[in-house]
Regions:
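Terminal connector regions
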Residues: 180-227
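Intrinsically disordered, low-complexity Pro/Gly/Ser/Thr-rich segments with frequent PxxP/GP/PP motifs
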Residues: 151-187
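Compositionally biased low-complexity segments at domain edges in trafficked proteins
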Residues: 229-272
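Short coil/turn motifs at secondary-structure junctions
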Residues: 132-134, 148-150, 182-184, 209
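Hydrophobic anchor at the start of a short beta-strand
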Residues: 1-2
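Short acidic, flexible loop segments centered on an aromatic residue
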Residues: 134-151, 157-159
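Intrinsic-disorder/low-complexity, polar/charged segments enriched in Ser/Thr/Lys/Arg/Asp/Glu/Gln
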Residues: 122-124, 172-176, 212-214
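Secreted, periplasmic, or luminal enzymes acting at the cell surface/secretory milieu
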Residues: 6-138, 144, 164, 169, ...
Length: 277
């Protein structure tokens, strides 16, 4: 038995998920929808689509959108913010980006053009995808980012790119994405779009919850200088740090004077001021 859905929005289909062996999401397929559905059901066409919405397990979870910010609805066995929507009660029935195929795919060899960039530079992300099944098919490779620490609440994950790749059985291809500075921006408390220095997670997945590969990326402020250039042994010296700047990977939530005992070799943005001159 196969359930074919013809609908225009997410549905609550827990019973079908539990008792029906297969579900085909057709949405509103148009005048040739019958032919397309038949080709998919009989195997003449290998589906490769992914959900652009989240299907909830219960209507009590609505609104249940992607991207989502950390929620207070926490499953006792989960840590808030660690697994995205899985941190909510029960999690989704089908997450954003989910979709099956008549074949299987393997993800490997995630690479960044650089592990450290400035807030003015792009970064190239590459990975390899292999068709490990017996049929040719398409996989939609999805790129997500996560801001590890930020001055304001941000989304748990952001979709920053996707690529549909056709692969024959046993074939491997390399997929490449480019992340620009604007892909790391957030709207701060002053309603300004900024890139805050710090650590980000770069994630490659088959859906928003099925993350196959991940790497850390550090972003530093443009023109960041070495503390060797200004730190002296005089304890009267200090650096006046403006809000949300970092030193030694620690985030400062207020304007804080840092004593002159800061160790040599630490870094700070070039627009910080040293007093006395």
């Amino acid at each position: 038995m196969v359930l074919v859905l013809i609908n225009g929005r997410p549905l609550s289909i827990n019973w079908a998920d539990k008792f029906v062996p297969a579900i085909l999401e057709a949405w509103y397929p148009g005048s040739q929808g019958g032919t397309a559905i038949a080709e998919a059901l009989f195997g003449d066409y290998n589906p490769g689509g992914k959900l652009t919405v989240t299907f909830p397990k219960t209507v009590g979870q609505i609104p249940f959108n992607f991207p989502a910010k950390p929620a207070s609805q926490v499953d006792g066995g989960q840590t808030p913010g660690v697994k995205g929507n899985q941190s909510r009660i029960n999690g989704p029935l089908y997450p954003f980006g989910y979709g099956l195929s008549y074949t299987t795919f393997e993800y490997s060899n995630l690479q960044l053009s650089s592990p450290v960039i400035t807030d003015k530079e792009p970064v190239t992300v590459t990975c390899k995808i292999k068709n490990t099944g017996t049929r040719s098919g398409d996989e939609v490779v999805q790129l997500y980012t996560r801001d590890v620490v930020s001055s304001v609440t941000t989304y748990e994950k952001n979709l920053r790119g996707f690529e549909r790749v056709h692969l024959e059985p046993g074939e491997t291809k390399e997929v490449s994405f480019q992340l620009l500075p604007r892909d790391f921006q957030l709207l701060n408390k002053d309603n300004h779009w900024v890139v805050e220095p710090g650590m980000f997670q770069i994630m490659i997945g088959a859906s928003s919850e099925d993350i196959r590969l991940k790497k850390g990326l550090e972003i530093r402020a443009y023109g960041q200088a070495s503390a060797n250039e200004i730190i002296e042994s005089d304890p009267r010296d200090f650096i006046s740090a403006s809000k949300n700047k970092s030193i030694s990977s620690m985030w400062l939530t207020e304007t804080i004077p840092l004593p002159g005992k800061v160790k040599k070799g630490n870094t700070y943005p070039s627009n910080w001021q040293r007093t006395p001159k």
